[in-house]
Each structure stands twice: as C-alpha cells, then as structure tokens.
Amino acid sequence: RMAEELLLSAVRGEGKEHGGKVVRLVFFTFCEDNREYQLQRSFLEQWVDDHFVSPRPVLSLVAQKPLVGELVMEVHSLPATAGEEVTVEEQMTSSVRYLRVTSGHYREIIAGGLYADDLTLPVREQSEQVFGKAEEILKAEQMSFGDIVRQWNYLERITDIVYGNQCYQDFNDIRSQFYASSE
C-alpha cells in the first residue's frame, strides 16, 4: 500500500512545473531474502508498466531498510525546458530496458536496476552479468565504460568473505576489468 501511494505521487507530479518527466525511480526497503526482493521488484515493475506511458521511468530496488519508515522512493526527473527540445526514448537491448535522452548535441543514457539473472550466484558471477548488461547498453549506444559519468552500485553484505574472497574485492576486480576495456 505504501509503495502504491508513493508511486501515485510520482505519477501525479509528472509533467508539472516542479516535476517534469520522471525518468528513474529508486526504492529503498528491507527485503527478508532474494525471493522477497524479486516479488517486490516484480510488483514495482508491473505498477510502473501499468501507470506510466512510454517512455516509462527505469526502476531500481535497493534492499536496504531506510533509517525512517519502511519504504523510501527517490524520484529523478527532467524539468521542462523552455526553447530547447528534449527527447526521451525508451530503448531495449536483449535483456535491459533503458532511456536515451537527447537534446541538440547532448545524449544521456539512463539505466537502472541492473542485476544478475540469478541472485544466488557468487558476487563475482553476478558482477560479470551486471557489467555485461551495462556493456550491452553502451555498445548499442556506441559508447564505452569511459563515457559513464555516474554509476552507483549496491552490494549486499559487501564486506563478507565468501570462498576466501571478500565480496567487494570480487566486484571491484570485475568492474576494473570492464572499465579497462575502454582505455
């Protein structure tokens, strides 16, 4: 119920002077396990599909309980611009939906919620899948990892040691590998 109220506020605010075009929704909430994460994510994705017209905002669900409350929603929007035409297009690779924002000589790619197909895999394999999806988007847009301006990653139990490796180190090794490909 709380998620639906938050989502409705984003839909109501879209297109208004203060809001603009909603391009990304980021939710923070506690998830008991991967099953609950996938259920909540599926609910949110379906809700966005049902209530927004194309181009629909991309969605991220961060399994981290907010300091206050049970659910927090962060809304990213593009303000309406006077005299400058901004185009937001919904794009799809074989596995990921993302947005392409263009204006004059400017182009921005907005993706969200990239996650591994199997959340039970070790961090190294999940990281390879996620960065592979990011690479797929970048190649479709004729870009490279060197073109990324802002990237935010959430790793569950980042300091855990699994199979003798720290989760963060495994993630960082894969990230470095993909970023090195654009040097």
Task: Name every feature range the model reports, one short phrase each.
Residues 1-183:
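Short, polar/acidic, helix-capping and beta-turn segments at strand->helix junctions
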